[in-house]
Structure formats: C-alpha cells, structure tokens
Design a protein with these regions (language model features):
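Hydrophobic alpha-helical segments
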Residues: 1-173
C-alpha cells in the first residue's frame, strides 16, 4: 500500500488539469507517481517537465531511450519503473528478447552505439554518477554532446523515479 495515497481524480487541483489532461492523452491515464507528486503541484509540474524533456522530446528515438529506462529501472530494482517501462518499451517496438538480454547486461545483439549507451547508463547507476574514462570515451565515439546530455539526463530522471517509487511504496500502474 502506498505510503502517501495518490490523489484521487475527484481531488485534482485545477492548476494541474493541463498536466493531467496531457498524461491522459499521451499515456492513457495519470500514473500513480504523478498522482502522488500532485500533493505538491510545483514538484509534479517540474518532474513532468523534466521527464518529458528527457524521454519524450530530444533527438534520440523513444525506442532507444526505453531500453535505457528499462536498464536503469532493473538495476535499481524498481518494480514500479520496471513495469511502466517494460510496457512502454514493448509499445515502442522493443522485443521481449531484447528486454531479457538487456536485463542480463548482455548487449552482444545490439548495435555498438546502443551497447555503449547502456554501458554508460549502467556505470552511472552502479558508480553513483561516476563513469570511468574508457566508458565515456566509448560513448563519445557514437554520440555528440547534446545526445550525451540527453542520455545522462534520462538516467538521472529514471534514478529519481525509481527512488520515489520505492520511498512512496507505489504499486505498478
């Protein structure tokens, strides 16, 4: 049971209507994470804006970013984020077999570009933000600075989402 009850639809503040309407349109509903953060509207708005910028916007394809989101969620042991990003990865064309391989840290079937990004994400999570020069050099062979910022920002917001899901004991949506 969630430590903080997610805000019920009947109690949605008017100021969050645009955010919730957008979530309903793009995700089919308002996830428990956002209903929980809605107790503090400014934090929800900032979280959603950052999440949107890192996952939905940018130059890298969503399918690729869902692989990174999945890996971070699994490394963090977040059932909430794992369930959500498994669903979105499948929706964006990632195969079950790819998810299983990524979950094992087996990147041999992936393009070297994707493997470098996943190793970077893994290093960020396991090293608590510290990434060795070899991993960064491999990443920078495949990605420009804007893309590297996008990948690092995605890993960061996924770490936050995984932490919040655990702290609030959120059930998978």
């Amino acid at each position: 049971m969630a430590r903080i009850p997610p805000l019920a639809p009947a109690n949605e503040p008017a100021e969050l209507k645009p955010v919730f309407d957008q979530l309903r349109a793009t995700r089919g509903g308002v996830p428990g994470m956002y209903r929980t953060l809605a107790h503090q509207p400014a934090i929800l708005a900032a979280h959603r804006a950052y999440f949107h910028a890192a996952l939905d916007a940018g130059v890298l394809p969503r399918r690729f970013k869902e692989k990174i989101a999945w890996r971070v969620a699994r490394l963090r042991g977040s059932e909430y984020s794992s369930a959500s990003h498994r669903r979105y990865a499948l929706k964006h064309g990632v195969a079950e077999s790819e998810l299983a391989a990524i979950d094992r840290g087996d990147y041999t079937a992936l393009a070297s570009r994707e493997a470098a990004a996943l190793r970077f994400a893994e290093a960020m999570v396991q090293g608590r933000g510290t990434v060795n020069d070899d991993i960064y050099a491999a990443l920078s062979q495949h990605f420009n600075p804007a893309e590297i910022v996008e990948i690092a920002a995605l890993v960061g917001i996924m770490e936050l989402a995984s932490t919040l899901g655990a702290v609030f004991d959120l059930a998978a949506d």
